[in-house]
Structures are given as C-alpha cells and as structure tokens.
Amino acid sequence: MSELLSFALFLASVLIYAWKAGRNTWWFAATLTVLGLFVVLNITLFASDYFTGDGINDAVLYTLTNSLTGAGVSKYILPGIGIVLGLTAVFGALGWILRRRRHHPHHFGYSLLALLLALGSVDASPAFRQITELVKSQSRDGDPDFAAYYKEPSKTIPDPKLNLVYIYGESLERTYFDNEAFPDLTPELGALKNEGLDFSHTQQLPGTDYTIAGMVASQCGIPLFAPFEGNASASVSSFFPQNICLGDILKNSGYQNYFVQGANLRFAGKDVFLKSHGFDHLYGSEELKSVVADPHYRNDWGFYDDTVLDEAWKKFEELSRSGQRFSLFTLTVDTHHPDGFISRTCNRKKYDFDGKPNQSFSAVSCSQENIATFINKIKASPWFKDTVIVVSSDHLAMNNTAWKYLNKQDRNNLFFVIRGDKPQQETLAVKRNTMDNGATVLDILGGDNYLGLGRSSLSGQSMSEIFLNIKEKTLAWKPDIIRLWKFPKEMKEFTIDQQKNMIAFSGSHFRLPLLLRVSDKRVEPLPESEYSAPLRFQLADFAPRDNFVWVDRCYKMAQLWAPELALSTDWCVSQGQLGGQQIVQHVDKTTWKSKTAFKDTVIDMARYKGNVDTLKIVDNDIRYKADSFIFNVAGAPEEVKQFSGISRPESWGRWSNAQLGDEVKIEYKHPLPKKFDLVITAKAYGNNASRPIPVRVGNEEQTLVLGNEVTTTTLHFDNPTDADTLVIVPPEPVSTNEGNILGHSPRKLGIGMVEIKVVEREG
C-alpha cells in the first residue's frame, strides 16, 4: 500500500509543478532535488533487491557507500550499467517535464504544494523507511532486556554419546521443497526430510541473512552484528571472543570438530570464526587441492559439491573407524546466486520451469541429489546408529534466477534432523529462527536447551514466539550484540608484526591491510575484503577532519604523500586527516611500534579535494616515475599512455588475461626508439610454456619463449615506422581460477610479467 501511495504523491507533485507552478529557479531546483531523491531511493531499493532479494537490509548497508567487488561481480555489470543509464534518462526526463511551462509566471501556492507532495512521496516510500530503520539501528544504545534473554549455556555436555554431521546447504531454503510449487525439484533430499524431524517455520532475521551470518546465528545463537561490515570478518584475529558457541561446547565435551567446504576458508573470516570456537580441523579449497581426485574441477567459488561431499564422506568414514567422538560440518556452494553451478556427477542436471530451463532450479536439483547421496551413505553405514545428521540452509536464497518464483511462496529456511539413535518422523510447525538451530542440536546431544538468544525447538520457546515484532526486536538488540566483541574505544599506540601481517592495538588484533577511523570515543575498523572497495576508495569517503590510520603497501599511498616509495611493496603507515596534515612511515622492522599522532590543524578544502580525487584514481590510470614497467605495483610508468589485456597486480607481478583482451597491448605516449632492446622478465602459464610467443612493434615481430619459471629475455627491435605500441600475443590462454579472487569468473592466463624495459640502442 505504501508503494502505491508513495508513487501517487510523486506523480501528483510532478503534474502540479509541471502544469501550475510556473517559472522559478529556486522552486524548480528544490522540487527536482526531492523528486530526484525519490528516484534514487527507489533505484537503490531495486538494486539492493537485485543483489540480496530482501531490499535494503543490514547485509547491504555497507554497499550503499562502497563498491561491490566480489562474488561473481561480472554477472552484475550489465544490470549496473542499466541502472546508471536508466537513472540518467529518468533525471533528464524529469527535468524536461518540470520545465514544460517555464514561460508561465511563478505561482507560490502550487510550487509549495508540489514540494510538499514530493517530500510526502519520499517519506512514504519503502526505501526511505528501510534506510531510516537501518540508521536508527546504528545509533541505538541497545535494549535493557537483552541480558534477560541472552543466556550462556553450560560449557560441556554431561555424557555425550552421539556424533554430529551438520550440512549447510548454500541458499537451500525450505521453499524449494514445496512439491506443489516446484514439482519433482528435490525428490531425493525431500524424501529424507520427510523421514526426520522437519521444522517447517524457520524464519530469517536481520544479521542472519548471508553465509557467515547464518553460521554464527546457528552456532552461537546471535545475529552477526559487528563494528565493521560482516563479510570483512576475514581481517579480525578472533570472532566474538567472549561468547560460548556450539563448537566450544563440543570441544570441551571431547569432540574433535571438523569443517569441510569447497571455497576458500578465508572468505568472510570463516576460518577465524571456526578457529575461535572449537574447530581445529578446517578444509577449504587450499587444503583440498592436494587431496581431491581432480584439483582442476572447480567453479567460480571453489570445488563442486560432489567433490566436497565425497571428501566429507571420506572424513566421516575415517573418524567413525577411529572411535573418537567428532562433529563434521560441511558447506555446499553449487546453489550460490545468481545462477548456481551443476556438478558433473549428478543425474539431475536440468530443471525446466515455466516451459524453459532454469539454471538456479537446475543447480538446486543437482545439489540436493549430491547431499542426499552423502546422507544415504551415512545411513547405510554401521556408524549411523551413533550419528545425528542435521541439514539446514545457511540463509534464504538471494536474487537468483528462481527468486521471483520463490517470492510467490511463504519462504522459510531449511532445518531438519535425522537421528540414527532414535528415528523420529514429524513435521513441527513451531515458529522459530536460525538462532534456534544450535540450541536444538545441543538439546539433542544432551546439553542445555538454550544458546545465546537461541532456544531448543524441542523443549524451549523461540524468540520468534515470544516477540511478534522479532525483526524489530533483533535490530534493537544490535548495539548489545556489537558490545559482545569487546572492541576497543581508543587507539593511542599500535604494533605491526610483519611476519604475521597483523596490527595490534588496545588488546585487539587485525590482519593487514587495514584502514581505521579514529575518534575520541570510537575506533572503526574498515578491512579490505572481496566485497569491499579498496581501502583508498574507502578513505576517499572520509570527512575532511576524520582522523585515520591506514596500513597498506607503500605504493598505494605513495602517489599522494610519499612519491619516493612509489615502487615499494613494503608495509607503510599513513595517518592524519584528508583536509589537514598526513604523514607516511615506512615499516622497516619485523616488529614495528608507533603512536597515533593526530594534529588539530586548520582544514584546507582544496587539499581535501585533491586528496580525494587522487585516492579515486583507478589502478590502470596511476602513473609513477621509473625506467621500466614494474608489474607488481598498480599503474604504469609515466611514459605509458594506456595498456590492456593485463590482470591486477600480485606480489610477484601480473598475468596476461585474455578475458580483458586477446593481446597484451602497451601504448606509449611517444614513439619507441628507432633501435632498442626489449628486456622482458616473465614466465609462462600452462601450455604457453616452451611455445613461441609473438612480440610485435609496428611491422616487426620477434619471438619470445618462456618456461614456467621466471626468466629474463632480451629482444632486439628496429622501429623505422616510429611505432608507439608493444603487442605480446600469448598462444594459448588457459581458463583457470588459480590465484583468482573468490567468486570472480575464471581468468584466461597466458604469460606472467614481472618487468618490461625499453633500452635504446646506439646506431
């Protein structure tokens, strides 16, 4: 209803101003600004909905001010371009309509009415309401009843007798199992669900709506609210360090805790969370690549579900034979939005809906088959009688190609339990949420029936039953939950450990690189993650007087305040204010100590603007002084006009990437010398090794041959035509995820470049 009212007010404002208000620059600007805000808010809502499927929620608050640079980002480029073009067109059309009768005399009453209607349209819009609620949740002091409902369980289970297998199905919500809505989509896993304890009303709450948040909620009984963006958790050294979580209780009770997934464990700090709470044995893409049958069989995120679940079965078999008490947690990935992935071993590779193939539904049908196969192996084993199997979704599906069909249904998370010791077949319609999962499992294993804000759905009362407004209540508890991190409120001294790549201050430790906003009563960490913008772009959003400490590779800050370090990949520390003074310090010791040194200086807005503009220069446009192209730092020498076909800098250099261009092309500002030596330090990838690699300057072509290790080769060129462009053509680019950013599409690698130098020859 609010959507219709909001749009009606918007339309009325446009029509009244366009036809009755007349000519007045001030009223035109004010009305266009407010109407433009309405458009921006609704496009923000649409864009957020596209990424999350749940509007402007806590999970995407961070992306309102930072770039989304991870998780299959290439699949979102076209929608993003469409939004920008659409926004430009709408603003242009809006301005044209409002000025239709600009030659008529100004009418104060109609102008005021149009502006008030425009303000009303903004106030009534769902986007404004959602953002307002999020802003309130950031500034609340907490709720006095939090302590009454947050309960810490006993740290041990008195007499544990059962092993635990806990399967997180990526985005595998219970809605997919509605056979009337989606016939024969999940027959194998659906049949197993119907054989166990099936909890049919597991709702999703704020702070539980993405993978690491769902894991924290289900194991600790609290939403993931943090003093930083949740997916940036990889930068912290400990995770809710004071809380007792399911893994802690299991470890204290004699369990060996294992976790197996196909993606990189570092993503979103899953490794930090699990190590902080009782898990000593972790297996992700890096750990599995040396043990899986086919290390090259991977999708954008890591290993496919069939590979991961095969390894989980091997681990279950090994641990069961040993006779030790254990828990085995695993997380699938093939159903990840926006499209999902199809494992090659499943029979269900294609699912049609509305008369056409649907990739997301196909991925769900395939993944559930793989999960069911894993469970059936356990059920057929002699160890099933000593095992509890839990299957849950980590969160509801985000905006995938099945999302519009899911939204027509009553959506709930998946959570069911199969007990080998005591088979139970029942569907329990009790109202509950993800935070109740850990408490329910703990209850089944013989422990307490509460865990944080979670309650056992077998013997307790969920917060979802106690509070009809549980979503609002959860947001009200947000400050209380953030305080559980015990995060410091001041930063005076700090230490950098180069061996561990860590910074320590006031008892807290963070991985590098890191940006910190420091005020009198708060220290706000801004880590760099797959989902966040680079730190320099985040720093560009700081106010002129905001105090900052920025620890990063020297070359990243050198272009601003330390040009002599433009080619250094060492750690540097910059601190100050963007509108005031800044200092850059080179970290030159293994253990390096310093103090914050913020000066209360006069703010120079011209300096501030210059700093912000420089911080926002994209990597490929950065230029540095050097007599060669150094590939392990961003940018290029000043003599280079532009370049293409080259991937991002890595610690050793850069790969060519045929996804960005079939050729490596470096165009110089001026013609290359008439005679010169081209000194190339590089290596080849895969089948490009020992193959002739054409290198062209103008009409002249030389051949470069590289191995898999870095070597230096000198090629001799004549350049009678004054050509200004160097072209290198890798013969056989290889599609691979090696060294790739998690969630990005595979790169097509050819040669790895360390340095290219042009040396003029005499004569």
UniProtKB/Swiss-Prot annotation:
Domain of life according to the entry: Bacteria
One GO biological process term: glucan biosynthetic process
Compartment(s) where it occurs, according to its Swiss-Prot or TrEMBL record: Cell inner membrane
Transmembrane region(s): 4-19, 26-48, 76-98, 105-127
Catalytic activity as recorded in UniProt: a phosphatidylglycerol + a membrane-derived-oligosaccharide D-glucose = a 1,2-diacyl-sn-glycerol + a membrane-derived-oligosaccharide 6-(glycerophospho)-D-glucose
Cellular component per GO, a single term: plasma membrane
Class of the enzyme per the UniProt entry, highest EC level: transferase
Assigned protein family: Belongs to the OpgB family.
Protein name as catalogued: Phosphoglycerol transferase I
Record organism: Escherichia coli O157:H7
Name of the gene: mdoB
